[in-house]
Amino acid sequence: MDGGGRVYIAIDLKSFYASVECVERKLDPLTTNLVVADPTRTEKTICLAVTPALKAWGISGRARLFEVVHRVEELNRERLAAAVRGGHIRKDADGKYDFVTESFDANALAADPALKLGYYVAPPRMKLYEKYSAKIFSIYTKYIAPEDIIVYSIDEIFADATRYLRTQRLSARELAMAMIREVLYTTGITATAGVGTNLYLAKVAMDIVAKRAPADRDGVRLAELDERSYREKLWCHKPITDFWRVGRGTARRLEALGCFTMGDVARLSEQNESALYRAFGVNAELLIDHAWGWEPTTVDMVKAYRPVSKSLSSGQVLKEPYDFDRGRLIVREMTELLALELVKKQFVTKKLELTISYDRESLTVLRPGTDMRDTVYAASRTGRVYTGAVTPDLYGRPHPGHAHGTGKLDRWTSSTKRIMDAVLGVYDRVVDPDLLIRRVNLAAVELVREDELPQEAPEQLSLFADCGEWEERKARERAADEKERRLQKTTLRLQQKYGRNAVLKGMNLLEGGTTIERNRQIGGHRSGEEDRT
């Protein structure tokens, strides 16, 4: 690789959550069949991680648990039939064919056709994964200073290695391998890496080229790209959705322009650049740069970036459909937690946004039509005719359109009471009481730090207003706000010391409440320390 410019390294820990679970069980992460999933959420739950050994059987890295169950059952039927045909299995005392025993190891399964394919289901332990991630980051900082590292996610980093190659007398490949080897020998977890002359090329080298390259004896894969090799190796690569920041929607719009590869995008940018700008607006610039293998952003620029506007949000998918009243309970709980989060992070807001997604089973067909537009639906819970929007879901089934509303406050605040009144007002206004609720999203937007509050506009009083009464009312409001503020801070201190479930409200104990369970989670998944919180 040309040593004249900057050199970046991207590292992605292989099946990180699953690898941690294997290491904790003293199992080989590369040969053990294991998925990380919470079976208490039913078999529809999405697997957070799947080991490479289980992926090799055709199981997706983001499969739902029931898909894993069905695929393994199918594989075992095929294995049993093949073992019987090969004479590896004899009939038992009941005259039936069955496996000798079960194995969770890929090598053992490959060596003995008489073994049943088994797999572990490991409940998520997010706190444990965070500890491993912190330990691995400390290893990276032995080679590269923290200011030259971007933590992209819990299991992925970017590093500007430019100024370390000469001092450590290593090539970029050698430096990346040294970092990965130490992580492997210290934690038992292997990784995939990409080296590139910019951040984009390092990412693509890792995501596309390295993950398709043969692994070494430790399961490590590494690839390098510069602008020239990128064009040689990847301009014809399909599908285009393998590239960073190219989703299915972008791919569909590119196909409409006759672009199916990055090479096609690069060619169109030369022949008819305006077509890309008409289709993608300002985002066309990023797409064109990436098509040519260009990326001007550096680690320093990423570190220095500050978003123009800030927001705090939370969302949850309910385990079962909730009616209007139980949905309102969930919104109250989420609002309480959001207000505490504002206080904790020292933000205030003037605007709240609430989005409610309904359950597909909310509707039944009252009178069939030729399509969704002229079909008459009724609410399945109440039988009332439904007149709202109906949209197809991913499978083409009719689904009620979501409800969305905005609540505005008359002042900057993090007061639970003020925010609660605004959010519940939105809920009561926009949510259809006949429908069943499945997903709730709540956001405080346009946040301002408490120490950066803009000057409030003066309040205009009428000529007939009683100024004394107005001042007394304002004083009472300030006193109530200050009292609530002290209570919020006390709650946060107690939660910090004794756990997030140390202070609860009566509503959290009602049937259907989810705060107690959510307080035991990290990022919406089990922390692994449920008994301690």
Residues covered by each model-derived region:
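Residues at or immediately flanking beta-strands
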Residues: 190-192, 353, 441
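Gly/Gly-Pro- and Ser/Thr-rich, intrinsically disordered tail segments characteristic of DNA damage-repair
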Residues: 1-290, 295-299, 469-533
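Short acidic, gly/pro-rich beta-turn/loop elements at beta-sheet edges
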Residues: 19-21, 203, 364-366, 450-452
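DNA-contacting surface of Y-family translesion DNA polymerases
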Residues: 10, 242, 252-437, 452, ...
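Contiguous hydrophobic segments
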Residues: 73-89, 324-332, 339, 435, ...
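Acidic, metal-coordinating catalytic segment for phosphate/diphosphate chemistry
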Residues: 20, 388-533
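Short, charged/polar surface micro-motifs in flexible loops or helix N-caps
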Residues: 14-16, 40-44, 359-363, 447-451
